[in-house]
């Protein structure tokens, strides 16, 4: 009897790389989306940290009046931000090689574009990586669908809104106070608080927080005790156990009696779908609202006040909102224009009925 021994063919380097990338045995799954996600998020993070600490002032309005955003130029953690690229650049793609010098690139806010483009590519790839890992493990794909809500929101404020407004200088600054400034100006120019899609987003976020707290407290209150009174109930759970860890019938009975019977879920799968779908759909609507307001399809306005039979204005909350919007619009970009667009385009109002007499 003859035994033939053959040497096992060694995998070439590319096949080893493919096997490593798609392996679900790694401590952290890489995946093909991860191959692009890792360098883009690293580039965005490194540039953000450097710019937040040391970037020179940026001519955001394109009128040769730079705005400081970094820590080394007088800001703190609250006021600091990566300032959006200049209005003089508009929507032009502005990588480093398009500038005459590095100083010019920094002056025109080039780091902002570098950060948001790499960041958006990175979070898109993170979403794809979630789908890829679910596929490898034989799971359903709804994790990446849920993650699409914050991805849509980030895309709306960093990409869609600047495109609609015609300049990346209108994008959201990368900082705490800059975010608040963006919100105030957005309200002033688009009346977002009166937009139904934003209202759905508020209901989604606050409702999701409420439902999450209700669910967590109900589960915690109806745990099946596997321990003695002197031990924590948490020690009664073993990872991977087949038994239920809480009594859904007890939780259903409690909540049904607290409100009414049909307010409580008796199906755990339907319950958890609802907990996921409510905030996701709400945030989808908010992102859609931002994307429509980007092209000036704004929230409801009540610019025509309610008047009585004699023509006297009956003040409502709408008048207060209008006045607040005008005030915020006057304050922002104070040197780029003298009046907000609403005032500059309206009919001139007389400020004096009779010419004053001058005693010379």
Swiss-Prot record:
InterPro entries: D1/D2 (IPR055266), Photo_II_D1/D2_sf (IPR036854), Photo_RC_L/M (IPR000484), Photo_RC_L/M_CS (IPR055265), PSII_D1 (IPR005867). Chlorophyll a PD1 binds at residue 198. A quinone binds at residues 215, 264-265. Pheophytin a binds at residue 126. One of its GO terms (biological process) is photosynthetic electron transport in photosystem II. Residues 345-360 form a propeptide. [CaMn4O5] cluster binds at residues 170, 189, 332-333, 342, 344. The record marks 190 as: Stabilizes free radical intermediate. The record marks 344-345 as: Cleavage. It catalyses: 2 a plastoquinone + 4 hnu + 2 H2O = 2 a plastoquinol + O2. The D1/D2 heterodimer binds P680, chlorophylls that are the primary electron donor of PSII, and subsequent electron acceptors. It shares a non-heme iron and each subunit binds pheophytin, quinone, additional chlorophylls, carotenoids and lipids. D1 provides most of the ligands for the Mn4-Ca-O5 cluster of the oxygen-evolving complex (OEC). There is also a Cl(-1) ion associated with D1 and D2, which is required for oxygen evolution. The PSII complex binds additional chlorophylls, carotenoids and specific lipids. The keyword Electron transport applies. Coiled coil: none annotated. Cyanobacteria usually contain more than 2 copies of the psbA gene. This is Photosystem II protein D1 3. The gene is psbA3.
């Amino acid at each position: 009897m003859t035994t033939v021994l053959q040497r096992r063919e060694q995998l070439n380097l590319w096949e080893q790389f493919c096997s490593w990338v798609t392996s679900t045995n790694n401590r952290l799954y890489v995946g093909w989306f991860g191959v692009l996600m890792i360098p883009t998020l690293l580039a965005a993070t490194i540039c953000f940290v450097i710019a937040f600490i040391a970037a020179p002032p940026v001519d955001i309005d394109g009128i040769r009046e730079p705005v400081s955003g970094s820590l080394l130029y007088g800001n703190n953690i609250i006021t600091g931000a990566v300032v959006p690229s200049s209005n003089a650049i508009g929507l032009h793609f502005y990588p480093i090689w398009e500038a005459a010098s590095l100083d010019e690139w920094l002056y025109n806010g080039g780091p902002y574009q570098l950060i948001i483009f790499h960041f958006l590519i990175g979070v898109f790839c993170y979403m794809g990586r979630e789908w890829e890992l679910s596929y490898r493990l034989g799971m359903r794909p709804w994790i990446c669908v849920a993650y699409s809500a914050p991805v849509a929101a980030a895309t709306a404020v960093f990409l869609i809104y600047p495109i609609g407004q015609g300049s990346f200088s209108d994008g959201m600054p990368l900082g705490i106070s800059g975010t608040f400034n963006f919100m105030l100006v957005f309200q002033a120019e688009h009346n977002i608080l009166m937009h139904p899609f934003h209202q759905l987003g508020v209901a989604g976020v606050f409702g999701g927080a409420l439902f999450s707290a209700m669910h967590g407290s109900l589960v915690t209150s109806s745990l099946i005790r596997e321990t003695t009174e002197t031990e924590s109930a948490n020690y009664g759970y073993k990872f991977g156990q087949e038994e239920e860890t809480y009594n859904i019938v007890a939780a259903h009975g409690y909540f049904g009696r607290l409100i009414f019977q049909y307010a409580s879920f008796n199906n755990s799968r339907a319950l958890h779908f609802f907990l996921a779908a409510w905030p996701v759909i709400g945030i989808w609507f908010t992102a859609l609202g931002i994307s429509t307001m980007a092209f000036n399809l704004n929230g409801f306005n009540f610019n025509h006040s309610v008047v009585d039979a004699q023509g006297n204005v009956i003040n409502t909350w709408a008048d207060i909102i209008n006045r607040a919007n005008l005030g915020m619009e006057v304050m922002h970009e104070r040197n780029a224009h003298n009046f907000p667009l609403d005032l500059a385009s309206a009919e001139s109002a007389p400020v004096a009925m009779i010419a004053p007499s001058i005693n010379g």
